């Protein structure tokens, strides 16, 4: 299982900038890309995977992000919205913290909101 967190961004996101803003927070994190896989992976200095970040996808169908995530009408979801999904290994509090910090930096730079699996 994974801890999933999604940035729902008003403006087209720049994940590289968000990754760069998170690297100093945990001291010694490294970022790399994976051919044919997520845009980036963030790793702990000991080499363990903390976060996988997927490419941004533009969701153009009105209400689709709300429907997919089960978000109620009381929450305003931008439209159209850029969807950036990240996954952290389950049971690793540091990985969840890095995932939340990344998504907060991403949404902070683009406007929007985040959703998580918990």
What would you call each of these model-derived segments?
Residues 1-118:
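Acidic (Asp/Glu-rich) sequence patches and key acidic residues
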């Amino acid at each position: 299982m994974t801890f999933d967190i999604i940035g729902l961004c008003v403006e087209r996101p720049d994940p590289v900038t968000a990754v760069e803003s998170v690297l100093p927070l945990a001291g010694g994190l490294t970022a790399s890309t994976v051919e044919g896989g997520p845009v980036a992976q963030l790793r702990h200095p000991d080499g363990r995977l903390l976060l996988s970040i997927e490419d941004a996808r533009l969701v153009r169908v009105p209400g689709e992000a709300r429907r997919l995530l089960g978000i109620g009408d009381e929450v305003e979801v931008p439209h159209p919205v850029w969807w950036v999904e990240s996954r952290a290994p389950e049971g690793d509090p540091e990985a969840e913290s890095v995932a939340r910090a990344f998504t907060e930096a991403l949404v902070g730079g683009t406007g929007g909101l985040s959703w998580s699996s918990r």
